[in-house]
Amino acid sequence: MNKKEELSFWQIWNMAFGFLGIQFGWGLQMGNMSAIYEFLGASPDQIPLLWLAAPMTGLIVQPIIGYLSDRTWHPVLGRRKPYFLIGAIFASITLVLMPYSSAVWMAAGMLWILDASINISMEPTRAFIADILPEKQLSRGYTMQSFFIGIGAVLAALMPWFLLNVIGMEKISSDGSIPDYVKVSFLVGGVSFLAAMLYTIFTTK
C-alpha cells in the first residue's frame, strides 16, 4: 500500500474549496425555497410536504453515489472528480432556473433535481479528503471543509440582504412574480457553485 504524502496548507485549501460553492447553493435553497413556494401560490400546509425533497434525495442518492464513486476511475479526472463535475453542472443550472419556475409543481421538481445534484457533488467531495490525506492530516482537511461550509452559509444568507439593502433592488415585484433579488441571488449561487467546484477539480491531483 502506497504511503500518502503530506500536503501543504494551500493544497488542502484547494481540495476543500469546492465546499464553498456547495454550501452557497445549499444555503440559498434552505433560505429561500419556502418564499418561492409562497410566491407561486402554495399554502402554508403544503410547504412541509414540498420540502420532502431534501431528506428523500439524501437517503436515495448518497449511498448510490458513494458506492459508484468508490468504483469509478476516469483517465483524466480520476476517481471522484467526475461526480464533482456532473453534480456541479446540474446543480448550477437548476439554481439559475429555479426562480423562473411558473408553478409550484415546477419548483418542487427543480428542488428534487437540485438536491440530487448537490448530493452528487457533496458526497464524493467529502470522501476526497480521506482518499488523499494521510491520517495525521485528516482533521485538518475536515476542518478546512467546515471553514468553507461556514463561509458559504454566510454568503448565502448575506446575498439577498446585500441586493436589497446595498444595491437597492425591490423586495416585491410589480407583477407579483418571484422578485429579481431572488433571481440574482440564485444566479450568483449557481455561478459560484460551478466555479468553486472547477477550482477544486483543476487545482488538485
Question: How would you name each of these model-derived features?
Answer:
Residues 160, 164, 168, 190-205:
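C-terminal membrane-cytosol helix-exit motif in multi-pass small-molecule transporters
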Residues 71-87:
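Cytoplasmic membrane-interface "Motif A"-like loop-to-helix N-cap segments
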